[in-house]
Amino acid sequence: WFGMDDFAPKVRHAYMNAVSKLYRDCFCRKIGDWCRAHGVMYIGHIIEDMNSHARLGCSAGHYFRSLDGQDMSGMDIVLHQVMPGMESIIHTSSCAGNNSDGEFYNYILAKLASSMAHLKPEMKGRAMCEVFGAYGWAESATFMKWLIDFLLVRGVNNFVPHAFSPIYPNPDCPPHFGAEGHDPQFEGFKTLMRYTNK
């Protein structure tokens, strides 16, 4: 973008408005209509890492429009984005930029998902989070319970654990639950899932 005095913000706003509406109408709603016509729920999330939910290129430019057409709102918590006691500081993370904006992940992201789930009647109050990914093998069942509770009190009520991998070892964003018997915390994970399903 080149500076054009007071005109540049107006152009940027009009561009983002037009592109994010086209994304909603020509992508999300089309996929959602196809899924429902074939008896499949359309769920997922966009890239929210490092506040990219409001940017084009790395994400869709508008959180609410980008999920319009889905049967649940969606988000993910990965890469040490949420850590106890780190909510008010930017801390190191293994995501793009090598740091994590604790305020966004602790106070905003889950509320975006739960708000959308309540604003869109067709979502029936369902807010989904892909959770536990890329915290590494040191992520304990105790921390996972803390993370589930953290999300529940913010209105997230459906969870997709990351990840169950058919191969071990798999370098993609551990932990991997089960891990062909190599995950010593798998018994704790089963207990956690029973807790979460209540």
Regions found by a protein language model. Name each.
Residues 1-198:
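Carbohydrate-binding surfaces of carbohydrate-active enzymes
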